[in-house]
Structures are given as structure tokens and as C-alpha cells.
Amino acid sequence: MKIHKCSFCGAEIPPGYGIMYVRNDGTIQRYCSRKCFVSATKYGRNPRKLAWVRKRQK
């Protein structure tokens, strides 16, 4: 089993968890939670500007 990384926050996603989102161009994006999924797709937020994201620049 492969452990994937969240496309938004960079957290590790264990097998059987998370959301796999396939865009129209065929790219696969994986999200650890609905919070990450909605922030990326619906609101178009930049993960580097959010305090709760692990990928954030310090």
C-alpha cells in the first residue's frame, strides 16, 4: 500500500482515507480532508497563506 500526500496541505494520507479528485485534463489530486478539498477547489485558496497548512512558508 502506498501512502499519498495531500495536494493542498502536504499531510500524509493512509490507504483508504481522503478524497481523490480527477480533473478534466486527467490530473489526479488527493486531499486528506474535506477542509483541504473545499479550500483548494471551491474557494481557490493559496495554501502558503493559511496558518493551519503544513506546507506554509515561515
UniProtKB/Swiss-Prot annotation:
It comes from the Archaea. Zn(2+) binds at residues 6, 9, 32, 36. The keyword Cell membrane does not apply. GO terms for cellular component: ribonucleoprotein complex; ribosome. One of its GO terms (molecular function) is structural constituent of ribosome. GO terms for biological process: translation. InterPro entries: L24e/L24_sf, Ribosomal_eL24, Ribosomal_eL24-rel_arc, Ribosomal_eL24-rel_N, Ribosomal_eL24_CS, TRASH_dom. Binds 1 zinc ion per subunit. Keywords: Metal-binding, Ribonucleoprotein, Ribosomal protein, RNA-binding, rRNA-binding, Zinc, Zinc-finger. Its cofactor is Zn(2+). A zinc finger (C4-type) spans 6-36. Part of the 50S ribosomal subunit. Forms a cluster with proteins L3 and L14. PANTHER family: 60S RIBOSOMAL PROTEIN L24 (PTHR10792), RIBOSOMAL PROTEIN L24 (PTHR10792:SF1). HAMAP family: Ribosomal_eL24 (MF_00773). Binds to the 23S rRNA. NCBIfam families: PRK14891.1-1. Belongs to the eukaryotic ribosomal protein eL24 family. This is Large ribosomal subunit protein eL24. It comes from Pyrobaculum neutrophilum (strain DSM 2338 / JCM 9278 / NBRC 100436 / V24Sta).
